[in-house]
Amino acid sequence: MRPRTLLLPFLALTGLLLTLLTAPPGAADSGAPPVKHSKYAGYLFAYFTGEGTADGEQIRYALSRGNDALHWRELNAGKPVLTSTIGEKGLRDPFVIRSPKGDKFFLIATDLRMYQNSSGSWDQVQRHGSKSIMVWESTDLVHWTDQRLVKVSPDNAGNTWAPEAYWDDELGEYVVFWASKLYADDDPDHKGNTYNKMMYATTKDFRTFSKPKIWNDPGYSVIDSTVVKYKDEYYRYTKDERDPSSSSPCSKFITGEKSTSLTSTKYDFVADCIGKGAMDRGEGPTVFKSNTEKKWYLFIDEYGGRGYVPFETTDLASGKWTPSTDYQLPASPRHGTVLPVTQQEYDRLLAAYPSSPTSVVDATAKHQKGYSIVTESASKVVLPMEPDADLRGLAPKLWVGEGATLSPKSGTRRDFRTPQKYTVTAADGTKRTWTVEAVRTRSPLLPGLNADPDVHYLNGRYWIYPTTDGFQGWSGTKFKAYSSKDLVHWKDHGVILDLGPDVTWADKYAWAPAIAERNGKYYFYFCAEQQIGVAVADSPAGPFKDALGKPLVAKGGALKGQMIDPSVFTDDDGQAYLYWGNGHGYVVPLNDDMVSFDASKVQDITPDNFREGSFVIKRKGTYYFMWSEDDTRSENYHVAYATGPSPLGPWTKRGTILQKRPEYGILGTGHHSVVNTPGTDDWYMVYHRFALNGPGRPGGDGMHRETTIDRMEFAADGTIKPVVPTLEGVKPVRR
């Protein structure tokens, strides 16, 4: 790589901190007990992104959000930081290791390029592939020596895949291991059938290697081993490469083993099928210990699917790995490695790989509620702050790229009750002005992960009935209720309906509820297994009892789309209407009992681009029909509306009224409901969005959503003004 001039972030560091951060670290001790103040400040993730693009088989970097191992930012704008110019000119499966003295790093990788079969077909590259690994050296993870190609496999090997290394104190050498197919000596053209075995060799300098030996040969193909040491035992995780069959049910998943000797050929079995049930298949495992607690992470590559999926455990010997529920990895990471880094290394990496010479790479401030949101295209930084944070003398720390300067300096105290301007000047004199805004963040409205909120004013209080979110495949089973006197402070009333014990016809997929009241009874409409049920109670807090013992709206009938997302609107004359649907929108008048309807009166009212989440209100004689468009997993999920003369329409589409606001980290805004403060013309929209990222907070996506609130206003002509999604939410509402 081109040499770089080192620039550390503009941070005011005390002498003590400088001493701690500049002291050379030792090798990461996987068996170290939990410590309150780790010498490591975060993690570096080196990876490739696959053979689907021309530069996908080159090495990329991502950096964790501090010591949060599940939330990451891409460095260098997601572009490669190391590219290969020799051998097969492709780099896969990068692995980075710190020397035992902590003064050097080695990066090794597979010499292979499969983009448009550059190196050949998958069969060919295992018969006549590279016998070498790629090697780089560095003292700082930024400046690397020229790459070198080092032969490690024997002459009869057909490939050299996914090299990794581990320092062995007893040997005083690195043990380097990889997968190879070995062909018979009398088969020089490698035409016979064989399978991958795990090989190893030792080295002190990654230049000269011992003669390779077979390390793991269970009698069938295995690849992609990774190792971590805890106390006196080495734990090895390897992909079972066999084709799935009744005799090998754990094929294409990970096997865990352990040994007190790293180079032993007889590891003890710990567990197999690791990853099964949470992913379709897995390879490329990388294992590492948490910097701050007794916990280990195992990232497994769901190749052909989502890419890396994180798992975690607090007991390596148990063999039990639990899928991490909240994470945000880089875009499309494939087989790579995670390395703990010190604060000095962390800062250096941030500065070395900005998106542009005038970028602000990151920012932090005391009393932040979530991670800073840096929007390169808008030259804007948003600091989500705690609701009671004092903004008058805030002194945020800002990182800029190497060779750049910042004015005013990072750490300068300023009054952030209004957004502040900073100027970044690159080494060539180019300048860019950035806006930094600190926002008191009252969002989310409800604690934890909640989606599809249905809000109503009942018995002198505001009530919200949401989907309990955060489950893979939206597989939750319980509904809760929350109430408030002011739309800001909410009481959790606990579980009001549990599908398992309370519903006989469904056990899971508890989604998108709705509430309605009639004659002192409360009717709770809910989704379960893509059908709509109804339960009844004497209080909005429940407990609710299934009213029918069967679905009110069943799947499998003549109606198109999914039978989900109920919503009830009651007109001034007392007639209640049930709206529902995914893909197609429907409405039907409910009978007086609120638990039945005349199926012949069902109407299809599907507007253009309708997805789901119907909701209807009435204001000044006009009916407003609202719904969500796109997919709840998309950051572009949004709300549109139409107006009409009756609850049944006809409807005239008016446009979008709620959509993402990415410069504030607000994405996936949708599946809303609306409430009016009685006796006023004040309206509020309650909706979900992707969860905000922050220390100990989930990363947002279509299964990790938070419920929030903003004002909804009308123009003089009765149209709805676009709702501006905010982090602030609303102030307490008093009647």
What is the predicted function of each stretch?
Residues M1-A28:
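Secretory targeting and sorting signals
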Residues M1-P3, L91, P212, T412, ...:
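Short, intrinsically disordered low-complexity segments
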Residues R4-L7, L20, Y195, D388, ...:
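Residues at the start of alpha-helices and the adjacent loop-to-helix junctions
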Residues L6-L8, L21, K204, K397-G401, ...:
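Hydrophobic transmembrane signal anchors and adjacent membrane-proximal interface regions, especially
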Residues G15, G256, A363-A365:
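Small side chains
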Residues D29-P357, A438-R735:
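Carbohydrate-active catalytic/glycan-binding domains of CAZyme proteins
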Residues S355-T441:
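Beta-rich interaction/scaffold domains
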